Amino acid sequence: MISLDDPPSSHGNHEKYFVMKLAFSTNAFKNHALDEAISIISKLGYDGVEILCDIPHAYPGAMSEERIAVIKNLISIKGIAVSNLNAFTLYAIGDVYHPSWIEEDLELRSLRIQHTIECVKMAAKLGSKIVSTEPGGPIISSSLNREQLLKTFIDSLTEVVPIAEKERVKILIEPEPELLIQNSQEFLELMDMIESPCIKLNFDIGHFFCVGEDLCKTIYKLADYIEHFHIEDISKERIHKHLLPGEGVIDFKSVFRTIRDVGFDGYATVELYPYQECPEHVAMKSLEFLNGLVC
C-alpha cells in the first residue's frame, strides 16, 4: 500500500489523502497451487491478489462450486481482496492469445466468448467486480482487414455484455503491443463503437510504455475508463519484457502522482509472470520498492 501526501503546509504537517492499493498476480506462481500463492501474497503484505483464470490456477472448466467456495473462504481468512480476475491467456485449450476474440473460425471464437462468460460468473462468486481480457487478439495471421477485425471483436464482446451487466462485473480490455488494440487512440476508437458501461480498461503501464506513449498524459487521457492497473517495469529500449519495478526506466513516482490526481481508488496489480522460478522473491522485492517510493 502506497501513501501519497500533500506537500508540507506552513505548519510543517502532511495531510495524507491518497492510498494506492497494491496486489500481486498469481500468474507468477504457476509452479504453486492457487491456495499457496494466495497465502504467500497475503503473507508478504499485499492488499490484494489477482487470480489467473487459466491452468494451473482457476480455469473455470476445472473450478467446481466447492472449489470456488474454498478459494473464497481462503481469501476471507487471509484478509486479502481479489483485485482482478485475469482472463487474458487460455493455455487450458490454446496458448497465450488463442482462441482469441477475433478468430475467423466461429467455433474457436466461441470458446473465447464462453470462457469469458464463465470468468464473469466466477468473478461474481468470488466478490470481484472486474475481469481483464486480451484486446481482440493477434492480427498478423488474419485475412481480415482492421475494420472487419474490430467488428468481429465488438460482436464477440456483445455476447458477453448481458451476462456481465446482470452479474455487475466489468470486462476490462488490456491493450498490448502487436495485438488489435495497442495504444490509447485505438482503445478510444473501440470505445466509441461500444455502448455498454461494463466495458472498461485495464491500464497496463508497461504495455503503453512499450508502444511509445507518455504514461502520465495517457492516464489523464483514459482516466474515465480505467478500472485497474497492471504494474511492471520496462527497459529503455521499450521491449515488451516485464521487469521488476525499479529495474527499468519507468518513472513510477510521476505515474503514481498522476493516478492520484485522476482520483483512481482501485487496485494496481504487479504482474511478473516471467519470474516463475522465484515468484515470492520478486513479489517481496517489488513491494519493498513500491512502498519505498517517496511521492
Regions found by a protein language model. Give the residues of each.
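Short hydrophobic alpha-helical segments enriched in small aliphatic residues
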Residues: D6, G12-E15
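A short acidic, helix-capping loop that chelates divalent metal ions and anchors anionic groups
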Residues: P56-Y59, I93-H98, I139-L144, C210-V211, ...
